[in-house]
């Protein structure tokens, strides 16, 4: 499944996020919550929501061209697996965000869930608002660098 769209949600007092209804079937077999490595200037940190199969594929592809004995491989491997958490949707279609991921992404109660192709991303709503406005301004320049027009 390709994850698309933007949805505003609120975490409950136990840091549970209700998954948007259109994605529940795709995530029914399990969920990996993971810290998203941010590489874009000004991008707020986020949590990614993956299917286990998609996350394993992402991790494998990320590590594929590195020597398993290199320091870079070990650092990436640690990040990918130490900053992720296996879980399942509960009966109310929620996932509990563990404290270490809440802290990593600096999430408050109000969040934005965005489709990012292979996964969903969860951002703090106030931090995401300024970032999304900035990205909209930069899209034409980014696309032009690759010979495309938006």
Label each residue range with its predicted role:
Residues 1-9, 13, 23-87, 91-92, ...:
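Flexible "stalk/tail and boundary" regions
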């Amino acid at each position: 499944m390709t994850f698309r769209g933007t949805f505003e949600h609120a975490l409950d007092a136990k840091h549970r996020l209700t998954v948007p209804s259109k994605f529940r079937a795709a995530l029914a077999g399990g969920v990996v919550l993971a810290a998203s490595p941010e590489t874009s200037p000004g991008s707020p940190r986020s949590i990614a929501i993956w299917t286990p199969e998609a996350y394993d594929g992402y991790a494998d592809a990320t590590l594929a061209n590195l020597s398993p004995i290199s320091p870079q491989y070990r650092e990436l491997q640690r990040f990918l697996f130490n900053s992720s958490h296996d879980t399942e949707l509960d009966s109310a279609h929620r996932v509990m965000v563990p404290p270490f991921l809440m802290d990593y992404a600096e999430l408050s109660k109000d969040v934005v869930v965005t489709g990012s192709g292979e996964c969903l991303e969860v951002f703090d709503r106030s931090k995401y608002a300024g970032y999304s406005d900035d990205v909209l301004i930069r899209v034409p320049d980014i696309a032009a660098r690759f010979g495309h027009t938006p």
